[in-house]
């Protein structure tokens, strides 16, 4: 990725509008969770948290948004989210994250998510869509207290499928680390998608002949890891999609990876998995979150 660093003919990294910052802090106030601190710098911003989950009126839903209509060359974004003790939060995006074509340099996004003691956090952004010649690196660092629960999702598309673009991006790298507050490593997911590299992105261990790849992690003390894995398997088995489920170390949870080529079918499958986890862990269904 460093080999692609250069001076673009548009606004360079570090210029106004190129460094997006979003800092959010949630605390439990009375009987519900509230956003008490917010700092945002364009192109990143949020919609005011909404209490629209009928089964969990204490849980705010926060939509992460971009004023720029997507990620463009030389963007440097950072999102820091601190969910304090006893909080319950759902975080998602307003729509898919579009990574636009780049002729110079690259774009990066760093996400730091902290789940405090006894918290319940859902971070479920919509899909990431890399356009032709996109160059993008994302690093997600999740710190989870042993008494906290985090549901974390990610979906990557092969490109603008409606336009026939499949793996026309230049590079797409993504690193995920899940740790305890003392630094103990629970999970690492390293994705290196380079259509021009030695390992084909359409290989059997990557996309194979599919157009979409999604992952869902459930780190929780609310149920044994085997039961979490069984919940995911039972939710996804009827979908007909290819998927694999595995438990995480130290009985801390489970995760699943799903591949497919029909965006609505994959979206329904991931929602079914999310809904099943909610019923199993907190006894309520997933809400209907309408998006544009």
Q: Where are these predicted regions, by residue range?
A:
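N-terminal, charged/glycine-rich beta-strand/loop interface patches
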Residues: 1-127, 132, 139
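N-terminal intrinsically disordered, cationic/polar leader segments
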Residues: 2-21, 25-41, 108, 114-119, ...
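A short, polar/proline- and glycine-enriched secondary-structure boundary/capping micro-motif
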Residues: 45-48, 100-106, 133-135, 161-165, ...
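Feature marks extracellular polysaccharide-active and adherence modules
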Residues: 84, 143-145, 179
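Structural motif
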Residues: 88-90, 120-122, 149-151, 214-215, ...
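Short, surface-exposed recognition loops or helix-turn segments adjacent to catalytic cores
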Residues: 126-128, 153-158
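A structural signal for small-residue-enriched, beta-sheet-centric alpha/beta enzyme cores
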Residues: 156-292
